[in-house]
Amino acid sequence: MSAEFFSSKREEGSLASGPSFRSNQRKILNLLLERDASFSISSDLPTTPVEKKLFGDSANLSILSGGTPKRCLDLSNLSSGEMSATQLTASADLDETGHLESTGPEQVRLAGMNYRQHLIKCSPAQLFCSTPNALEHGRRKKDAICGSSANKENDNGNLVENEMKHLGSPITTVSKLHKNPELAEDQAEEISDELMEFSLEDQEKAKPPLNWSSLYRSSSLPDSLNSPSLKQVVKFKDSTIPDKLKKKYCSNQKELGKGLGLKKMVSLCDINMTQMLEEDSNQGPLIGDFSKVCALPTVSGKHQDLKYVNPETVAALLSGEFQGLIEKFYIIDCRYPYEYLGGHIQGALNLHSQEELYNFFLKKPIVPWDNQKRIVIVFHCEFSSERGPRMCRSLREEDRTLNQYPALYYPELYILKGGYRDFFPEYMELCEPQSYCPMHHQDHKAELLRCRNQSKAWEGERQLQEQIALLVKDVSP
């Protein structure tokens, strides 16, 4: 209805009486309410989205006034889902004479504007409806107002969304889930699945790779800093072996490993094997076949692979102090013949060439009559630095070739430390004749040259024979 209706009714009310006018007007109002369901007041001002939210799309209002409402409108026809919660209570206040307080359309517009501003500033108005649905919706609205602190962000979002749509803003918001519960559940499941996939991908990306640190290692860092060793000791609960037994078992295994290693090294290096066995025996150095301890006391010398004895030991040997252990001994003088004739130890044999040495000892090996006694050979030259040690090694090598390792014909070979030069001044009485002829004597230069050439020829022949023997072994199947 328009504002002209109110102006015409006001003119008729002035002619009629007060009570009759009031009853007639109420009937007309009820008829109009049943027909149109509400009074529509048109204002020149455009409605905002906030007003649409509060008043609804139709902006249904009763006659507005500044006083309290005196009649609750029956808005049962308007309770249709969404609009049932936006019904407002208002009635036209009449004065005692039956006249309306608002006398014109302008006052109605002003009253509507003031009431709209009042509703925007204040909390939502309480609704009085005649239908149970409206009452229930009003109760729900009241509960929602009580929890407005929790739902404030959602309400503000809805208001902003409606206002954007009214103003034609290009900014859009995220669409809500469908009102259909089945579709809403499907959408919720899809969203939850996507969120789970994103969370799993983030976790996988967040996990650092295990081996990338070694691939992208800085070359300036040392290996100990860049790739720390992570050692973890795993202890099993079911293990019933005590720690003491474990340590004992490990030590036994280590000792067994050492023993096996020693047996394996015998065929590789005689010197290392001899030194190890000597350290283990704690009784002294062993003889060449590793069966017994040396009968003569040894001292350190120039060559570590050979055993040295001092002049005192040789003198004791000559005097017969080792008869209980030694059945026979030989002192080999490796000097040249003119040196030997110039003075030598009592009972010494002059063998200055390898051929003579082999013929004497290896052509017919000397075997002791008593197996408990030994045969001892002592080599020496002027200083026991070259010729004596060379002859001793030569005899040992040839003896090895004739026997199966570690057996030897002559397992005990010694070197007189210091040679004849050191022995003669101390034990001149044990020398025959009691004199000393050096190798570089002026009277024996020609003889020295002849002996050297002869020794070189013998050495060349020996090397040639060894090469021939190696070739024969390689050719033979």
UniProtKB/Swiss-Prot annotation:
PANTHER family: M-PHASE INDUCER PHOSPHATASE 3, M-PHASE INDUCER PHOSPHATASE DUAL SPECIFICITY PHOSPHATASE CDC25. This is M-phase inducer phosphatase 3. The active site is at residue 381. Residues 325-432 form the Rhodanese domain. The modification Phosphoserine is found at residues 20, 38, 58, 62, 65, 123, 130, 169, 192, 199, 218, 220, 476. It is found in: Nucleus. Signal peptide: none annotated. Its EC number is 3.1.3.48. Residues 1-20 are annotated as: Disordered.
